[in-house]
C-alpha cells in the first residue's frame, strides 16, 4: 500500500 511504500522510502533515505 502507499503507507508501506512511503515508509520504505523513508527508510531508504536513512
Curated annotation (Swiss-Prot):
One cellular component term from this protein's GO annotations in UniProt: extracellular region
Tissue-wise expression: Expressed by the skin glands.
Subcellular location: Secreted
Residues recorded as bearing Methionine amide in the entry: 14
UniProt key word Secreted: yes
One of the protein's GO biological processes: neuropeptide signaling pathway
UniProt entry keywords in alphabetical sequence: Amidation, Amphibian defense peptide, Neuropeptide, Secreted
Keyword Secreted: yes
Functional note: Tachykinins are active peptides which excite neurons, evoke behavioral responses, are potent vasodilators and secretagogues, and contract (directly or indirectly) many smooth muscles.
Family, per entry: Belongs to the tachykinin family.
Protein name, entry field: Ranamargarin
Organism, as annotated: Odorrana margaretae (Chinese frog)
Source taxonomy: Eukaryota, Metazoa, Chordata, Craniata, Vertebrata
